[in-house]
Amino acid sequence: MAFKKKFTPRRKFCRFCADKDLPLDYKRADILRDFITERGKIIARRITGTCAHHQRLLTREIKRARQMALLFYTAGHSSDVKKKSQI
């Protein structure tokens, strides 16, 4: 007895191919945070829907932003920053 799928997943699309004006730059940490988990890992392209070309660029820019201290390497740092600012 075969099981039928209850739903059909919607087709994923690359945000950067759809919107040519959306910059993919290490200085735009707000955009890059959408492609990182709360633990600091880069999300795979099969989940985000980005094309292979833009996933390579995205990975490079995330790594640059980490080196420039615009993004954190691991989780837990944002709470540390809040504690230091409260002192």
UniProtKB/Swiss-Prot annotation:
Keywords: Ribonucleoprotein, Ribosomal protein, RNA-binding, rRNA-binding. Pfam families: Ribosomal_S18. GO terms for biological process: translation. GO terms for molecular function: small ribosomal subunit rRNA binding; structural constituent of ribosome. The keyword Ribonucleoprotein applies. It comes from the Bacteria. One of its GO terms (cellular component) is cytosolic small ribosomal subunit. Belongs to the bacterial ribosomal protein bS18 family. HAMAP family: Ribosomal_bS18. Binds as a heterodimer with protein bS6 to the central domain of the 16S rRNA, where it helps stabilize the platform of the 30S subunit. NCBIfam families: S18 (TIGR00165). Part of the 30S ribosomal subunit. Forms a tight heterodimer with protein bS6. This is Small ribosomal subunit protein bS18. The gene is rpsR.
